Amino acid sequence: MKYIGLISDTHGVFDEPFREFLAPVDELWHAGDFGGGLELAKEIAAFKPLLGVAGNCDNYDLRYEHPLTRFFECEGMKVLMTHVGGYPGKYDCRARQLIDELKPDIFVC
């Protein structure tokens, strides 16, 4: 079983306390707003394998490498990840459409 570290809204900060806390995880999922551009994403990816999406504060270079939404499978579970998706009962229109279409087991936002 994979041990996943779920982070978001780092806004340019990924320093030692984060690294210590996340050291045991197998993989990191970043739900957007990396901040610091592609360089921060590369720094995080050098620390642990990374799957991420761009947030509303992320620049074009980062968005080129990390899409606004990501749909993938992890250990037999379908995962949909986006930065801003709303919450149960009040999902963003775009998120609701993707949830209805893709039927993920896990929705990360």
Label every model-predicted segment.
Residues L51, K90-C109:
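Conserved beta-sheet core of the metallophosphoesterase superfamily
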Residues M1-L50, D58-G76, M81:
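N-terminal active-site segment of His-dependent metallophosphoesterases
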Residues T10, M81-Y87, P104-C109:
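Histidine-centered catalytic micro-motifs
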Residues F18, V84, D92-R94:
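A short secondary-structure junction signal
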Residues A54:
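Extended, loop-rich substrate-binding clefts of extracytoplasmic carbohydrate-active enzymes
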